[in-house]
Amino acid sequence: MRILISNDDGVTAPGIAALHAALADYAECVVIAPDQDKSGASSSLTLDRPLHPHTLGNGFISINGTPTDCVHLGLNGLLEHDPDMVVSGINLGANLGDDVLYSGTVAAALEGRFLQRPAIAFSLVSRQVENLATAAYFARKLVQAQGLLDLPPRTVLNVNIPNLPLDHIRGIQLTRLGHRARAAAPMKVVDPRGKAGYWIAAAGDAEDGGPGTDFHAVMQGYVSVTPLQLDRTFNDAFRSLDGWLEGLR
């Protein structure tokens, strides 16, 4: 078993080191990750300049690009042997609900699945490393589960681990994505020369976070496992849209 590990926090982030350590004695692991923090990169590819791999002293490979770039290169000839699976994380910070639209952590897994490998993304619901060992434990547990290799086509798993010690975790729940309220307005800043700039503000709170959602699971102390699909077609809208378009044809 060969596993390609990536993330969006960057190749030197503590989460990817913890993930590699958790899986290194289970499989042959190769780390390919961005050379800097690329949180929020989503599934973007770098098309305006060449990408340069650089092998660090610990054997990890850094790329001057996005998480999707890293997985794309890793599964398209950069490595001598093709990986069998893609594992992304461990992200420091939640990827719940609508976060998946922006997450580079989730995007790395999606790229792996697009390139026909089983893929899973892990996030610790905290910006701190205190309970990173809890996330690493569940990452190993879920990666080793045989069912990951039998996922439906074009499906990945998005896993969020509560910020709790291992013995406080209540179990694992299969969940759907919740939804966040609208984010706060961007924060305006003015530099010493009077030029305005803007910081993207924090994500909104959970608006749809009731039982069955990923938000609810982690709030109750459960690891949340949410299946995501590459196909974003909203099939239930076909009937109403067909009637609307009929008058335009």
Swiss-Prot record:
Q: Which UniProt keywords apply?
A: Cytoplasm, Hydrolase, Metal-binding, Nucleotide-binding
Q: Which ranges does the record mark as transmembrane?
A: none
Task: Tell me the InterPro entries matching this sequence.
Answer: SurE, SurE-like_Pase/nucleotidase, SurE-like_sf
Question: Cofactor comment in the record?
Answer: Binds 1 divalent metal cation per subunit.
Primary location class: cytoplasm
Superkingdom of the organism of origin = Bacteria
Task: Specify the protein name.
Answer: 5'-nucleotidase SurE
Q: Which organism is it from?
A: Pseudomonas fluorescens (strain ATCC BAA-477 / NRRL B-23932 / Pf-5)
Question: What gene name is listed for this protein?
Answer: surE
